[in-house]
A protein has these predicted regions:
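Intrinsically disordered, low-complexity, mixed-charge
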Residues: 1-100
């Protein structure tokens, strides 16, 4: 069982050249590698949105990765809105959601 006091949930908005470059799948793969749960999806405005949840250190490592993204991506802005300490909706895995 995960220690919820060490868990963190962040909502990410990522802008730049992040669609059509494998960003979502690469984020999902990195999240799974780090043991982070949540979801990722494209936005109609050209950005990518994600909710990431897991041990604080793993979530922080994923945010560092997300600021770079995969090789073909060019991240110009990443906004992370913390929801640390709250575990309103625990995620079981990491999903790719339809665009919104």
């Amino acid at each position: 069982m995960t220690d919820r006091s060490d868990s963190c949930t962040l909502h990410l908005d990522v802008s730049g050249r992040v669609q059509g470059v494998g960003y979502r799948e690469a984020l999902r793969a990195e999240a799974l590698r780090l043991g982070v749960r949540g979801w990722v999806r494209n936005r109609y405005d050209g950005s990518v949105e994600a909710v990431i949840q897991g041990p604080r250190a793993a979530v922080e490592r994923l945010v560092v990765w997300a600021r770079r993204g995969p090789p073909a991506a060019r991240v110009t802005q990443l906004e992370a809105r913390p929801d640390c300490g709250g575990f309103d909706r625990p995620y079981a895995g990491f999903e790719r959601l339809p665009s919104a």
